[in-house]
Amino acid sequence: MEHADQYSWIIPFVPLPIPILIGMGLLLFPTATKRLLLFPTATKNLRRMWAFPNILLLSIVMIFSLDLSIQQINGSSIYQYVWSWTINNDFSFEFGYFIDSLTSIMSILITTVGIFVLIYSDNYMSHDEGYLRFFAYMSLFNTSMLGLVTSCNLIQIYIFWELVGMCSYLLIGFWFTRPAAANACQKAFVTNRIGDFGLLLGILGFYWITGSFEFQDLFEIFNNLIYNNEVHFLFVTLCASLLFAGAVAKSAQFPLHVWLPDAMEGPTPISALIHAATMVAAGIFLVARLFPLFIVIPYIMNLISLIGIITVLLGATLALAQNDIKRGLAYSTMSQLGYMMLALGMGSYRAALFHLITHAYSKALLFLASGSIIHSMEAIVGYSPEKSQNMVFMGGLRKHVPVTQIAFLVGTLSLCGIPPLACFWSKDEILSDSWLYSPIFAIIAWSTAGLTAFYMFRIYLLTFEGHLNVHFQKYSGKKSSSFYSIKLWGKEEQKIINRNFRLFPLLTLTMNNNEQPYTIGGKKEARITITNFGYKKAFSYPHESDNTMLFPMLILLLFTLFVGAIAIPFNQEGMHLDILSKLLTPSINLLHQNSNDFEDSYQFFKNATFSVSIACFGIFTAFLLYKPFYSSVQNLNLLNSFVKRGPKRILLDKMIYLIYDWSYNRGYIDMFYSISLTKGIRGLAELTHFFDRRVIDGITNGVGITSFFVGESVKYLGGSRISFYLLLYLVYVFIFLVISYFILF
């Protein structure tokens, strides 16, 4: 493809025919679709035929994106082409495409992850009545994201930005008949509207400043205005903050992060796509695309890094006590996105994009593996997310789903930062750069790396080690037919927040006659013992997923193993470069402008040793607390060996319980928003309604009623004689003239 840049405009439009054709078919032939349900096997095969062209078209885009990346690595310059849509004397609105290293990186990321998710979804969603609708939404999602990354101006970005938000709304609420899913998609939509409104205001503000929406013109004009001090700096900072607000909402940064855990109500494949390469990546992409704009405003760079470090720590602490496997991974995504924002705020453009790449493949692997786990658990507990996604009911899955276990373990180790897996290289680069930026931020970032290792191995141990805990909850297995249709995924129950959450969620609290209780905070607590191991009953067990679901996981496993190699230096003409650096050259990087091979190698090994040590400490702590020591022993009292009562131990327990209550209840942030914002807005609406009905309507109705009674009084007073009416008329005219005379003269 010698001149592939010239045909890059087709990238967003290649997958577009699929949602159009599926949508037309569902609208024009709804009756035929319902009749096909009478023939389940034929219907399933017919529907799955749509998966092949979907995957094929996205594969074409992937090949095209790879060619663009190769051209960028070989030194191709930025390519832009625009078509004028609206031309006026003072205004010209243009559409086009913009090809640079960032575009090629994002295109490869979207297409590769998208292809694997589509292959996986073919089997995962095969028994769902909404199979075709799901694939239509997924294709539209990929199209919207590809359009976003190839946009050449802010208006075009905003259009595709809204399309990405709409697709996420449709996919999060895919099972819209479930109240939890319907509420989750509304929450995501409303939360993102806040950021989108800020983004729109920021776009209009910068157009008012520069008179252009085009990226290259915008950057050049704005830099000249800043250099010549021809613009009000406070107004510029406000507009840049509004632009950043869009990225905060889309990438689930504090304080607009609350939609991300609830987004797990959607099907697991879409969770993988949202968290790896589409919606949450859009916010990082926006900041990276507008990086030349933000970099000349120091206050905005400080704000970006501050929001990033807060999100890093908050996401990690909220993941500590989650029992839902997908929500635990969701908070993990939030924390890792915080690392990317932190890197961008520090000026480490390369490290941020590198972590975006490595995290995408690792997190896609983890979500697809969690989907395989959920799929296997549904055969036992039924189609209920409260059970199939709850790690309390899992355990011991290592021997039942060995391939999934290996995939999940590799993804977990990568996210923990264990070499030579993908996330080790990118996270270590961010951690190293943090020392150059701020020691306080560095301490928080390094400490959170240990927390990441802890909560990720907590998820792994609760899921795969020990015994299958659902058996001790006395759930019987459920057989499923060869074809079944899922409309309502279980009945919705009211969620009760457990305010007495404890460190060991899988253990039961019992009291034997010969045991003495211990006291914490004035409350008597029972000692922890393991029970129910004597329960004898035959159960069904989880089974490994089909090859269609395992194949994408294995390919993503290979990506997780080897994608970090793009940052390994190679020698070219006496210069030590790597593929990522050649791809991003001459992108801006404030840090590491001068390098020395020996010093860099020494610093790398020193930082790597420190980061791996912190990760290993987190893993060891997770093993200490969650490794099932009771696997071969019945009714073992853990407190006899683990707990030695004393003042220091009681204080430590209080701190642990406080942290876990904070984490389990999402830091009480959702509760705060519910009380302060939701109830406050509803109270204001009720007050406005009362004022409108009682005051505004009261005045209007009062005037009408008063006029009515005055008219009735005059009517009866006059006795229905015309002469009396004429007299009153003349009196009123005289009074009016007298008043007018005194007013005028």
UniProtKB/Swiss-Prot annotation:
Keywords: Chloroplast, Membrane, NAD, NADP, Plastid, Plastoquinone, Quinone, Thylakoid, Translocase, Transmembrane, Transmembrane helix, Transport. Belongs to the complex I subunit 5 family. It catalyses: a plastoquinone + NADH + (n+1) H(+)(in) = a plastoquinol + NAD(+) + n H(+)(out); a plastoquinone + NADPH + (n+1) H(+)(in) = a plastoquinol + NADP(+) + n H(+)(out). NDH is composed of at least 16 different subunits, 5 of which are encoded in the nucleus. The chain crosses the membrane at residues 9-29, 50-70, 99-119, 135-155, 157-177, 194-214, 229-249, 268-288, 290-310, 337-357, 364-384, 406-426, 435-455, 550-570, 610-630, 724-744. It is a multi-pass membrane protein. GO terms for cellular component: chloroplast thylakoid membrane. Disulfide bonds: none annotated. Its EC number is 7.1.1.-. This is NAD(P)H-quinone oxidoreductase subunit 5, chloroplastic. Pfam families: Proton_antipo_C, Proton_antipo_M, Proton_antipo_N. InterPro entries: NADH_UbQ_OxRdtase_chlpt_su5_C (IPR002128), NADHpl_OxRdtase_5_subgr (IPR018393), ND/Mrp_TM (IPR001750), NU5C-like (IPR003945), Proton_antipo_N (IPR001516). The keyword Coiled coil does not apply. It comes from Gossypium barbadense (Sea Island cotton). GO terms for molecular function: NADH dehydrogenase (ubiquinone) activity; quinone binding. It is found in: Plastid, Chloroplast thylakoid membrane. The lineage of its organism: Eukaryota, Viridiplantae, Streptophyta, Embryophyta, Tracheophyta. GO terms for biological process: ATP synthesis coupled electron transport; electron transport coupled proton transport. NDH shuttles electrons from NAD(P)H:plastoquinone, via FMN and iron-sulfur (Fe-S) centers, to quinones in the photosynthetic chain and possibly in a chloroplast respiratory chain. The immediate electron acceptor for the enzyme in this species is believed to be plastoquinone. Couples the redox reaction to proton translocation, and thus conserves the redox energy in a proton gradient.
